[in-house]
Amino acid sequence: MADILQMHDLKPAPGANKDRIRVGRGEGSKGKTSGRGDKGTKKRYQVRPGFEGGQLPLYMRLPKLRGFKNPFKKEYQVVNVAVLAELFPQGGEITVADLVAKGAVRNGFPVKVLGDGEVSAAYTLKGVKASASAKSKIEAAGGSISED
């Protein structure tokens, strides 16, 4: 019966593994300069990353970053009352899900209603924030806004 090939029987193909080049071990094999060329800084030691030969480095030429990014900032999707009047001309109760269904906003982001435009119908907005002008226009038309 033939032997089954096993992991410990595997070995690299002939010539696949070369010996590493041992530099600096005599003139016959990469001796003397060890592949670093003649003279100069890079022959003697390594320079730090970002070193430009004495020229003012890029990280010092560029301006410093000012301020900071607030990690708790809330980005609202805005909808104007004119858009509400266009999408819901009959008025009624409007939720974020209704706005998503009509394509006015994307799902998963908070919504804020702004006061650009005119309101003719009474809207009951739920789960949205509203600017002062939007709130006054909606309430003047007989509507209401709740943020919960």
UniProtKB/Swiss-Prot annotation:
| Region of interest (Disordered), residue spans | 1-47
Residues spanning the signal sequence: none
Entry-linked SUPFAM superfamilies: Ribosomal proteins L15p and L18e
Give the Pfam families listed for this entry.
Ribosomal_L27A (PF00828)
- A GO molecular-function descriptor: structural constituent of ribosome
* Cellular component annotations (GO), alphabetically ordered: cytosolic large ribosomal subunit
User: Its Gene Ontology biological processes?
Assistant: translation
Write out the coiled-coil annotation as residue ranges.
none
What ranges does the record list as Basic and acidic residues composition bias? Answer: 1-40
Q: Which UniProt keywords apply?
A: Ribonucleoprotein, Ribosomal protein, RNA-binding, rRNA-binding
Q: Which InterPro entries match?
A: Ribosomal_uL15, Ribosomal_uL15/eL18, Ribosomal_uL15/eL18_sf, Ribosomal_uL15_bac-type
Tell me the subunit arrangement: Part of the 50S ribosomal subunit.
- Similarity section: Belongs to the universal ribosomal protein uL15 family.
- Purpose of the protein: Binds to the 23S rRNA.
Q: What is this protein called?
A: Large ribosomal subunit protein uL15
Q: Which organism was this protein described from?
A: Bifidobacterium adolescentis (strain ATCC 15703 / DSM 20083 / NCTC 11814 / E194a)
Q: Which gene encodes it?
A: rplO
